[in-house]
């Protein structure tokens, strides 16, 4: 029976992980395509928090002083996964839950647009066990959720999830540091912290501390924050399903001008435009 390329890298047994890790293809493409207003774009999702609570976190509030706070940025829906899918392809494509979903290979994602324009891309996923992993992975010491498929914006698209060369650009978060050191970061990036650091299984305090610890040194790193770099730090959805789905969102990087507050109404599909 032929192996389904959309599920061939989902095994989580230790032996399977080690075997796949030893042979997994990893790619770190670069490019220098000039955009209209920015040349590098980084999107980071934190998890499940209402705007007012996130805005009250001291570390997130600090980051807001370094860029532009978007007062009217809305997540698309509930629960988590459709918001990530929308960030990767400008639509939820009918996905309404957090299960193991697959979107037909004929459906375009942001990757198709980027590659057509010869813009390099990668996604960095904290605690993904190896490049191109298609499943969900738990902490091997304590059994906690670490990397989850539902928080990956691209793997559900079969145009990515069944293509070895595209899977090679869906990488463990540790490879971000390597690519940064080698000056081989791409022009488009999506970064997902693990289930603790994004606040999903912890708190907004943990998420805010992680975000500041990660971003603050990068803002002064010339290899990362080049002249036309735009970073969007946001939450996938609000905590409350009964309120409007407004989420704390900050634009950072040298492509922005600090001390301004934006009044545009935006959502997760906007970032693929």
Q: PLM ranges: what are they?
A:
Residues 2-273:
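Flexible, surface-exposed loop/gating regions in the mature catalytic domains
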């Amino acid at each position: 029976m032929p192996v389904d390329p959309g599920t061939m890298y989902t095994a989580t047994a230790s032996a399977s992980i080690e075997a796949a890790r030893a042979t997994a293809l990893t790619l770190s493409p670069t490019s220098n395509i000039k955009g209209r207003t920015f040349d590098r774009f980084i999107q980071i999702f934190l998890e499940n928090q209402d705007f007012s609570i996130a805005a009250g976190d001291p570390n997130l509030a600090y980051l807001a002083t370094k860029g532009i706070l978007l007062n009217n940025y809305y997540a698309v829906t509930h629960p988590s996964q459709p918001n990530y899918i929308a960030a990767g392809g400008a639509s939820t494509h009918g996905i309404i839950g957090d299960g193991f979903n697959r979107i037909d290979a004929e459906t375009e994602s942001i990757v198709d647009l980027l590659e057509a324009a010869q813009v390099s891309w990668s996604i960095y996923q904290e605690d993904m066990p190896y490049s191109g992993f298609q499943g969900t992975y738990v902490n091997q010491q304590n059994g906690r959720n670490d990397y989850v498929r539902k928080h990956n914006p691209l793997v559900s698209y079969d145009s990515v999830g069944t293509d070895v060369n595209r899977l090679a650009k869906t990488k463990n978060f540790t490879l971000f540091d390597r690519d940064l050191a080698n000056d081989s970061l791409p022009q488009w990036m999506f970064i997902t912290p693990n289930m603790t650091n994004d606040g999903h299984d912890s708190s907004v305090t943990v998420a805010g501390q992680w975000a500041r610890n990660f971003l603050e040194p990068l803002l002064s790193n010339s290899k990362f924050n080049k002249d036309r770099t735009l970073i969007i730090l946001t939450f996938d959805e609000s905590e409350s399903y009964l309120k409007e789905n407004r989420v704390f969102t900050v634009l950072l990087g040298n492509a922005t001008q600090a001390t301004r507050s934006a009044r545009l109404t935006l959502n997760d599909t906007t970032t693929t435009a």
